[in-house]
């Protein structure tokens, strides 16, 4: 099967996919006809394409945006890029605020489509709301810990929920459990999981928490349990579900210690296998469906 045939099969199967980080290519998630396993492909405007890993894609996307902190490219602190391949286009908006929070908003859409006069930016490219998917990547250092998140916005919403302001106040209890499990993990080197902890019966959200299981390597860290608790609590307190049904926050100390916090609505397909929900920097993952409100 030729490159263009594969490309068309990818677009036909999934319609639209995820992000772009350069002017001559886009990234599409799809699979070859007759195969059930999705892969991530980098597709160039000349029709050539090759498979990439999730980490390669994320490094490409964030690597361009990291240049925004360089004084020589200060204009990249606020910039936008549009790339198109055949009938699929991707629009990437970069922003770095004064507190160092990096936000990358991505929309992926098919053309030609109906014009959306409700948005000047969308109207310029003839983007139809129903044919567009939105995703956001964020990263920030909180309490000395690297915190990152990636989200999809869905066409339907679960009940509005503020994780920091809930009457059930789950954040403090969750982070206390994270702290105690982290202490144990650093001494026993076993990794740990907290599975399906119901945090609010009114809206049916549950939480699953895990450290990466790297044996003794996951114990060799300078990250204190208090720092991890502080970062987790501040990140969770900034979260609002909006139109999100499942998301993940990733924490690491820049070394070997890694912690993933998955919050999942009972309406989400992910409830059947929460550990299959990918997280930012998740090793070996070629998918994305995790979340952050940019920790504001």
From Swiss-Prot:
Keyword Glycoprotein part of the UniProt annotation: yes
GO molecular function: toxin activity
GO CC list: extracellular region
Chain positions carrying an annotated carbohydrate: 46, 71, 122, 146
This protein's UniProt keywords: Glycoprotein, Signal, Toxin
Signal peptide positions (record): 1-20
Family: To yeast YER076C.
Function of the protein: Kills sensitive strains of yeast.
The protein's name in its UniProt record: Killer toxin KHR
Gene: KHR1
